[in-house]
Design a protein with these regions (language model features):
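Aromatic-rich carbohydrate-recognition surfaces in CAZymes
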Residues: 1-48, 70-78, 163, 220-231, ...
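Catalytic cores of carbohydrate-active enzymes
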Residues: 49-55, 59, 67-70, 76-198, ...
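N-terminal hydrophobic or amphipathic segments with adjacent small-residue motifs
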Residues: 43, 146, 211-212, 260
Length: 295
């Protein structure tokens, strides 16, 4: 499948670059591509419900089982809209931001939504201290998604109580694991689980999602970089712990910057020399030093 999240990342990157450098000429050049990207994301809503539909393998977790209205893609698109609007200051974009924010907050955790997106599934949704990974026609995918939840913290979605409980959950999980970092998704899917066949068959070349590795509960420095970024203002000491953990993994084998690690054993997995592993450390470190980003 194609990658839905690349559009949002492009917009976030351009807007933050413009904000940092004040290179308005560059932004002017990129404005039309940005607007085309936002228009395409609107088209991928399919029924104008303010939630983008993402095919399986349609984002960074390209061999995982999430599909449908994936939470990570919704909050990433919201971040892109907010970044763009801080430069453009558009009433139209402001209204879209409000609608997208409302439908996210009302549908990805149990509560008192009067008009849930998936009424039958929402009725049986159990309360958890984090945002659900996805909604699709079959119901909710309720695993913990560290990347999506980290971006949600960055954007301050949910009320104070929800965010407090969210961080408590994430910290309890992080501290319970060998590497003292968050896994990409949790719990791992095992061969005896109902979803195993779906996971096992979703690979193009070779199967990498054994339990505790890759997207199936593996630890990614890049993902933890965004978690550290999201809590750096409120909990700088915790952010510092996470940065130290990221640097420890990146420095394996003479700074080989491995893609990810086995959460259970701590062994390096994935390919070497990944720029995104280095980027996770940089963004976490700079955030904890007071560097601000559009959000």
């Amino acid at each position: 499948a194609g990658r839905v999240d690349t559009i949002s990342w492009f917009i976030i990157g351009v807007c933050n670059y413009t904000n940092s450098t004040k290179d308005t000429a560059f932004f002017t050049k990129m404005k039309t591509p940005i607007e085309k990207g936002l228009s395409l994301l609107n088209a991928w809503e399919f029924n104008n419900n303010h939630l983008v539909y993402v095919p399986r393998s349609g984002n960074w977790a390209d061999e995982y089982i999430t599909e449908g209205h994936i939470f990570y893609d919704q909050v990433l698109r919201l971040w892109a809209l907010r970044c763009f609007n801080q430069i453009e200051n558009s009433q139209h974009i402001s209204e879209k931001i409000n609608r997208v924010t409302a439908i996210i907050e009302e549908n990805y955790t149990s509560g008192t939504s009067l008009h849930p997106f998936h009424p039958r599934a929402y009725k049986t949704l159990k309360k958890k201290p984090y945002w659900m990974a996805s909604i699709n026609p079959s119901g909710y995918q309720t695993m913990f998604d560290a990347f999506g939840n980290s971006i949600a913290l960055l954007l301050e979605l949910g009320d104070d109580t929800f965010r407090t409980n969210q961080i408590i959950y994430m910290e309890k999980l992080r501290k319970s694991l060998k590497l003292k970092l968050l896994p990409a998704f949790w719990d791992p899917i095992f061969p005896e689980d109902e979803q195993w066949k779906l996971l096992e068959n979703n690979c193009k070349y070779e199967f990498r999602n054994i339990p505790y590795e890759f997207h199936n509960g593996g630890t990614w420095q890049m993902v933890n970089g965004f978690y550290s970024m999201s809590i750096s203002e409120e909990k700088p000491d915790v952010a510092e712990e996470i940065i130290a953990g990221i640097e420890m993994l990146n420095s394996e084998e003479g700074y080989s910057f491995y893609e990810n690690f086995n959460t259970q054993t701590g062994a390096a997995t994935g390919v070497k020399y990944c720029t995104w592993s280095a980027a996770g450390q940089i963004i976490a470190t700079q955030s904890n030093k007071g560097k601000t980003f559009l959000k």
